[in-house]
Curated annotation (Swiss-Prot):
It is found in: Nucleus; Cytoplasm. Component of a trimeric complex composed of STK11/LKB1, STRAD (STRADA or STRADB) and CAB39/MO25 (CAB39/MO25alpha or CAB39L/MO25beta): the complex tethers STK11/LKB1 in the cytoplasm and stimulates its catalytic activity. GO terms for cellular component: cytoplasm; nucleus; serine/threonine protein kinase complex. This is STE20-related kinase adapter protein alpha. Coiled coil: none annotated. Transmembrane segments: none annotated. The keyword ATP-binding does not apply. Keywords: Cell cycle, Cytoplasm, Nucleus, Phosphoprotein. Expressed in brain, hypothalamus, heart and skeletal muscle. The protein kinase domain is predicted to be catalytically inactive. The lineage of its organism: Eukaryota, Metazoa, Chordata, Craniata, Vertebrata. Residues 11-321 form the Protein kinase domain. Belongs to the protein kinase superfamily. STE Ser/Thr protein kinase family. STE20 subfamily.
Length: 389
């Protein structure tokens, strides 16, 4: 953890950029006064948390202290201030991959950009799996990109250890808490909750779903009822990349992104009739062809039988990544154009909800989870010292 002081007076809270955790959490852009560096501060009202919520937060902080990898979001400081848990992390100037496809790449990113992003995520997953954990929440909103184009995996709150009494378990059975918003990304074996359990290969399925999300502009199974989604996955329905090889040619002449939604098992967030500045319809947004290596990569990740899915380490050697010739920090900023990272904070006032980041009021990257009860007042058994990691 970086040498940032665990003292709230060292941080000037600026624009609110997100809320979550049953509205018990507020996320601020902040300035670290000793260095002038801009950071993100997540503040959780502990007095309103249930004991279960506190235990959940303790688990995340334990993992954040344990992990140390260049593709996992580092926690700069964690501490208690006036009955609030403060978590300080770097400010990610490009936001999350979900932010990018919602605001700029509504019909999907380029294949090369996706390759760079997924390579970073797989490196993080390979590390997490070797540490004996399952991530259980791989999705675009948990993939963050820094100002210099580096890729980071977040969402550590959902991590589950597969080590019990010093022994690595073959499978686990725990269903992720507060997981309603992550259901489309979860593997069939996690969803079915049977005695067979699941292991780290469940994260590989989530990689396949995330690849489709980044390529198609929307997550497969979007807005599908939970029961139907479960049946589709258990019956072996496999989402795909939307391009000229998966969409009938006659539909590609319709010049809409909505016509092909069923093939991706979801509905695109793009406007139905895409029009140019002169009012004329443009070409169909999915009139493109992804490489056979990309299709194969997704197919391997989405195998119904987890035993047939490659490990994260094996996937890093997949031919899909041979197109990568440079470091992500060199290539991604170019591939994400015309998007530019947020680096100008002039005019951003303390606690100003309409400041420079007003456009990202509900950044999905920071929407932690939803729960059901917050009536029980928590008792911090180990005191504030536990939280100062």
């Amino acid at each position: 953890m970086s040498n940032f002081l665990p003292d709230s007076s060292c941080y000037e809270l600026l624009t609110i950029i997100g809320r979550g955790f049953e509205d018990l959490m507020v996320v601020n852009l902040a300035r670290y006064k000793p260095s002038g560096e801009y950071v993100t501060v997540r503040r959780v009202n502990l007095e309103a948390c249930t004991n279960e919520m506190v235990t959940f937060l303790q688990g995340e902080l334990h993992v954040s202290k344990l992990f140390n990898h260049p593709n996992i979001v580092p926690y700069k400081a964690t501490f208690i201030a006036d009955n609030e848990l403060w978590v300080v992390t770097s400010f990610m100037a490009y936001g999350s991959a979900k932010d990018l496809i919602c605001t700029h790449f509504m019909d999907g990113m380029s294949e090369l950009a996706i390759a760079y992003i997924l390579q970073g995520v797989l490196k993080a997953l390979d590390y997490i799996h070797h540490m004996g954990y399952v991530h259980r929440s791989v999705k675009a909103s948990h993939i963050l990109i820094s100002v210099d184009g580096k890729v980071y995996l977040s969402g550590l709150r959902s991590n589950l250890s597969m080590i019990n009494h010093g022994q690595r378990l073959k499978v686990v059975h725990d269903f992720p808490k507060y997981s309603i918003k992550v259901l489309p990304w979860l593997s069939p074996e996690v969803l079915q909750q049977n005695l067979q359990g699941y292991d780290a290969k469940s994260d590989i399925y989530s990689i396949g779903i995330t690849a489709c999300e980044l390529a198609n502009g929307h997550v497969p199974f979007k807005d599908m009822p939970s029961t139907q989604m479960l049946l589709e996955k258990l019956n072996g329905t496999v989402p795909c990349l939307l391009d000229t090889t998966t969409i009938p040619a006659d539909e590609l002449t319709m010049k809409t992104s909505r016509s092909s939604a069923n093939y991706g098992l979801g509905e695109s967030t793009a406007v139905s009739n895409v029009r140019a500045a002169n009012g004329e319809s443009t070409l169909h947004p999915y009139l493109r062809t992804f490489s056979s290596c990309f299709h194969n990569f997704v197919g391997q990740c989405l195998q119904r039988n987890p035993d047939f899915r490659p490990s994260a380490g094996a996937l890093l050697n997949h031919p899909f990544f041979k197109q990568i010739k440079r470091r992500a920090s060199e290539a991604l900023p170019e591939l994400l154009r015309p998007v530019t990272p947020i680096t100008n904070f002039e005019g951003t006032r303390p606690q100003d909800p309409s400041g420079i980041l007003g456009w990202c009021q509900t950044w999905s990257s920071w929407m932690w989870m939803t729960g059901n009860s917050r009536k029980t007042k928590t008792a911090l058994g180990s005191g504030g010292a536990f939280w100062t990691l």
